[in-house]
Amino acid sequence: PAYTIIGANGKERNTTLRDAKKEGLVPSVTTVLNIVAKPSLENWKINKALEASIELQQGEDEPNEEFIYRCKTAQRDIGQSAAAQGTKIHALIERGFEGKSNNKSYRAVKKFLDKHFPNEEWIAEDSFCSELGYGGKIDLYSKSGIFVDFKTKDGLEGKDPAKLVFDEHGMQLSAYAQGCGFDSPQRVSVFVDREQTDLALGHIWDEDSHIKHVEMFNSLLTYWKLVKNYDSSTL
């Protein structure tokens, strides 16, 4: 994956669409999915900003604009902290499946997978590039066609994993499977609690929804190519 590139000034920076067109790079599955609004995520951001407005006190002479900015900054800091914790947990699970660590997040995920898919050989954080013009890095999969994606979330205790998933989660897994040449994959979304990191809940997607999710993703991929005026599959 080419998430970053060395710029003209010799410093590393995020890869842009202009870089992709110049170098013949493909968008990731996540990049394609990000073209669609995520109401649940936006609602979470709004809630955090509102919570910040309650906790923070507006100065007597503080203009509304400055107070709003402080609330937005507090919300952004919370989001960045949650993302950082998610990245840390992902790394721990990856190291576990690579045989480099026996941490509790890995054990919780492995316990769920062993229960439903015993005796599988798992491959962690592997990349692919599809001739359809997209690519990605898969959290975990097996050569038998089981694709697993990890998400981190707060307050998982007592939750029903079936109520935690959205179509975008299924689309992501289906896009990975399609990119790796699997027509009838098994797809699994695993949620790990950000605080209680030994708590993992898994949802196994029904096979029938794979066709729908592939079509949904491919429609978004076509839309992305048209909006960005870039189709790497024709290069």
Which functions belong to the PLM regions below?
Residues 1-135:
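Metal-dependent nuclease catalytic cores that hydrolyze phosphodiester bonds in DNA/RNA
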Residues 101, 229-232:
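Residue-level signal for secondary-structure boundary elements
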Residues 122-230:
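Mg2+/Mn2+-dependent nuclease catalytic core
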Residues 235:
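Acidic, carboxylate-rich catalytic segments that either coordinate divalent cations
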